[in-house]
Amino acid sequence: MSELRAFSAPGKALLAGGYLVLDTKYEAFVVGLSARMHAVAHPYGSLQGSDKFEVRVKSKQFKDGEWLYHISPKSGFIPVSIGGSKNPFIEKVIANVFSYFKPNMDDYCNRNLFVIDIFSDDAYHSQEDSVTEHRGNRRLSFHSHRIEEVPKTGLGSSAGLVTVLTTALASFFVSDLENNVDKYREVIHNLAQVAHCQAQGKIGSGFDVAAAAYGSIRYRRFPPALISNLPDIGSATYGSKLAHLVDEEDWNITIKSNHLPSGLTLWMGDIKNGSETVKLVQKVKNWYDSHMPESLKIYTELDHANSRFMDGLSKLDRLHETHDDYSDQIFESLERNDCTCQKYPEITEVRDAVATIRRSFRKITKESGADIEPPVQTSLLDDCQTLKGVLTCLIPGAGGYDAIAVITKQDVDLRAQTANDKRFSKVQWLDVTQADWGVRKEKDPETYLDK
């Protein structure tokens, strides 16, 4: 490509389907977030006399943020790190994109250097020890530490990185990708799922990558064997098996566009504590296996409550679009958040569904020892529910101590409501909203770069 080009992918919040999303039987609701990961692909460069490709991925927002890899068709497109700095997510993206497209060295002898700059919006990382710069209409933070040393907020930075880097790297091989992201969205998604699972060393549910590719969605996962059955990267059959998986295999996956109702918005609260998701998941799995059939009954109740929650949001969305007197009364009642809310089933259905979800997670917390909704979070959520304009609130994702999600009327300002209130002293409201769109092309790519 002879032109500079930029792409971005959203973060995520899993609002319904925590733990159940790991099972192919259950659907989940994933909201894409306005916090985005960005990739700027530079025009082709040339390494004269080289029989290898070189990929340079740079992240100027972090100390020592540069990763160099050589890739050769002769060695099965296995990336070889140059200079010692490695990143498993970048490495697996490179391996899979090259293995899928199988570029011929003769066709790229004068354009075998690929340079990509990565940027992340503020909300993904702690802002301590950072300097903020404005690049175009974007606010970017530049950190004094290495990327692995900067605390993350749990919005899906690795899935966003893998998805947007897959898109940017693929644009070197697909001339019309920049202006036709929709055309290649499924290929991008499938390649990113493979790379992300390999980089993590496990076959996750994939909801975070799906949200990065598609935005806000209703999601049911793919069978793990699709990816675990792939041969080793670099093997003689890897490229053909990967291409078959990406292009021809039935993934048996559900990805349906879905979104929060018009007139409502999402607030994400970052709590100054952390949870180890892997340990939580393992504790819940151990509990589930040892408490059958009671655990299956709880999961079934959770699934039904998740469906009622999603269906209730859809009803509110349709209602808001009517703009009639009844709709106005409901949203006025919600703004006051007083006893009049009990008159409207459109409000109580959502709240009752979330109450069931939270009650089930508290039961699992008590029986498994996994702090999905520990008492301190229960108190915080109950306090949030009393705020003006709040429809409902819950623990997103796998739960724990590190985040809350609150759905409110569109024009509500939770920062103003909770300022100087000791009950919310540990909550930092993140500068994010819902984003219905997934990976996409960005305008004015030159505005990302130093002048």
Swiss-Prot record:
Location within or outside the cell: Cytoplasm
| Originating organism | Saccharomyces cerevisiae (strain ATCC 204508 / S288c)
Which PANTHER family does the entry mention? PHOSPHOMEVALONATE KINASE, PTHR31814
Record protein name field: Phosphomevalonate kinase
Q: What is its EC number?
A: 2.7.4.2
Q: Any additional notes? A: Present with 79 molecules/cell in log phase SD medium.
Q: Which gene encodes it?
A: ERG8
Stated family: Belongs to the GHMP kinase family. Mevalonate kinase subfamily.
Mention any one GO cellular component term assigned to this protein in its UniProt record: peroxisome
Q: What does this protein do?
A: Phosphomevalonate kinase; part of the second module of ergosterol biosynthesis pathway that includes the middle steps of the pathway. ERG8 converts 5-phosphomevalonate to 5-diphosphomevalonate. The second module is carried out in the vacuole and involves the formation of farnesyl diphosphate, which is also an important intermediate in the biosynthesis of ubiquinone, dolichol, heme and prenylated proteins. Activity by the mevalonate kinase ERG12 first converts mevalonate into 5-phosphomevalonate.
Q: Would I find Cytoplasm among this entry's keywords?
A: yes
Which catalytic reaction applies to this protein? (R)-5-phosphomevalonate + ATP = (R)-5-diphosphomevalonate + ADP
A Pfam family the protein falls into: GHMP_kinases_N
Chief place where the protein resides:
cytoplasm
Instruction: Report whether Endoplasmic reticulum shows up as a keyword of the record.
Output: no
Top-level taxon in the UniProt lineage: Eukaryota
